[in-house]
Swiss-Prot record:
GO terms for biological process: nodulation; regulation of DNA-templated transcription; response to symbiotic fungus. Pfam families: GRAS. It comes from Medicago truncatula. This is Protein NODULATION SIGNALING PATHWAY 1. Expressed in epidermal and cortical root cells. Residues 471-548 are annotated as: SAW. It comes from the Eukaryota. Residues 331-373 are annotated as: Leucine repeat II (LRII).
Amino acid sequence: MTMEPNPTSDHILDWLEGSVSFFPSFLDDPYNNGYIHEYEIWNQNQDISNQYQIDANTNSSNATNSTTNIVAASTTTSTTSLEPNSFNNIPFSDLPKKRNAEDELSLKKQPQNQKNKRLKSRPMNESDNGDAALEGTVVRKSGGNKKGAAKANGSNSNNGNNKDGRWAEQLLNPCAVAITGGNLNRVQHLLYVLHELASTTGDANHRLAAHGLRALTHHLSSSSSSTPSGTITFASTEPRFFQKSLLKFYEFSPWFSFPNNIANASILQVLAEEPNNLRTLHILDIGVSHGVQWPTFLEALSRRPGGPPPLVRLTVVNASSSTENDQNMETPFSIGPCGDTFSSGLLGYAQSLNVNLQIKKLDNHPLQTLNAKSVDTSSDETLIVCAQFRLHHLNHNNPDERSEFLKVLRGMEPKGVILSENNMECCCSSCGDFATGFSRRVEYLWRFLDSTSSAFKNRDSDERKMMEGEAAKALTNQREMNERREKWCERMKEAGFAGEVFGEDAIDGGRALLRKYDNNWEMKVEENSTSVELWWKSQPVSFCSLWKLDKQPE
């Protein structure tokens, strides 16, 4: 599918380059502020406008409030109609800075009486591009750097469902609105502020600002097919580190382990309902687990009354690598590093459990071309489809690849289908403009980053950076076409499936698993018990549902 171009965003780089001479180098590396100090706009000796008062004598315990207030000041002061060069009047010293040794030395040399000034934003009554003007408040700047400020405030998880504390979104979303509306001055201003606050080792807000800034500059850049520099993803890592990091993530977060647990229990439930225990079990794996899901399933299968089936076939549909270098078309969490092979280890483990396992991989096989022949299914086996976090990559407009694929699955006559997906609104260009879609992507990534803040206590963890870098693909992937659980259920019914009630083992197992994790995670079971949802801080993250063939389709 080819995405519809956005005439405004397609040409935005042209007018950015024509207006600001240093934007090309800034877009190439938004975190290298070496370029910035070469330009007069960043002269720290500029006179401070009378509308500001400065107070730099604040300790790091107020870092979170400091940043929030700076956001309020910067969004407020940028809501008025700006002249072409009006951003030159915004002093660099008003922004929280990434200090180096020189900066710290210069601060120490400042006269003591200059540390007691106070910075306030003037009150504004108008908003621009749909962004509500924020009431100006006292801006308190941390005496330390962002990293220290973040440590002083812990993981900032208390801001998970508090819009006022989620300051990164208050910068990213208005910037996307400004890009959509073609407001050059506002884009400039917000990109500068984001550049100063972005950090991959800060709290969830700082990390969201970092990934969001990369995504926005990536959107503005002409080289949109390349992966933004500095991001660690699955494909950029070494296979052993990749597998180790996945296992660690499953241990610390239920983001994937919870739906996998429900799916495994559902497969056993479907298998137990089959009258013939001597049939081959064939699992069609369309997921993102990279093999991590199956060891616990094989163990449970070996303990099953009557023993495991005589043969277990696992057909893994790997994500197509034809777009491996095009982040705009790559489903998050779907493509591992080159050389990653979990088959040998899984086969050895199955042998130790006396489970006769066969693994077949379908590489470079798009879901749109999947059929019974390519899967090699037969009527004398028990086929169960496990589709997790991959089907939202299929187009749901014209052509409606999503509904067609579900009908293909129906034609294979599986005994059960487990569907797990993100529980959120669509972000594609057909369901809204760039600003609308971007705000939904940011919301998704915030929940991921906020939850990993609680899971990974080490801010410099490479494992956490890899998982978050992979999740951040959602900000740039043009095929992130999610839908709410209700819409997915409607599609499944239209394709000829009927919802199946989860058994007690699946429900109780899911609840028991969540007790291992942060208490902000919760599980919600729908009234008819055919769908289970995973929530983080009272907000939906994903759902898992169980389906069988509707014997009497309407």
